Amino acid sequence: KYFYADQYSNDANWQAHYLTTAEEIWTQTKGKITHFVAGLGTTGTFVGTGRRLKELGNVQLISLQPDHPFHPLEGWKHLATAHRPGIYDDTIADTTLIIDSSGVFDIIRSISIHERLFISPSGAANLLGALEVASQIKEGDIVTTLADTLDRYQEVRKEIFGI
């Protein structure tokens, strides 16, 4: 016997973020969040969190996609060339930004040096997206997610740090 979660088509994926991630963000920002920025993989984080944040307030939702199909962002989808997840709702995003995936390793290196955080490639891409949004607005409270750490990406660690 086995269980296949099918996170790309399982409504429980986005519902978990609707019920938990969005509420945590709303509570921790005291409702001051103005922009939510997240990359699209299974799309559960973006769809669930985005739906709930839209209900709670006037939050701009910015989805992120890699700049080409052959990118280093494990888990992310280049939706123009990939199979669209069944749970994806393309009406939710106010804006979609295309992330230059070549800058991801520089962000990982910089954040590790200056903040002592070892973020994953997808986390670095989310951070790039949040920084892009920050450069386009006068003020606001921008939130993104860092879903995992660099621990799972031995080849990336080797390429960036030689370890």
Task: List each model region and its residues.
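Glycine-rich beta-alpha junction loops
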Residues: 8-12, 41-44, 65-70, 125, ...
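Active-site/ligand-binding-proximal alpha/beta "capping" segment
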Residues: 3-41, 102-117
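Hydrophobic/aromatic residues located in beta-strands of well-ordered beta-sheets
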Residues: 4, 36, 58-62, 142
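Short glycine/serine/threonine-rich phosphate/pyrophosphate-binding segments
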Residues: 40-50, 122-130, 153
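Glycine-rich phosphate-binding loop signature in dinucleotide/nucleotide-binding domains
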Residues: 1-2, 25-32, 56, 133-140
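Active-site/ligand-binding loops adjacent to catalytic centers
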Residues: 1, 54-121, 136, 157-163
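Generic hydrophobic alpha-helical scaffold/packing signal
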Residues: 50, 96-97, 109, 131, ...
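Phosphate-binding loop/pocket of nucleotide- and phosphate-handling active sites
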Residues: 131-163
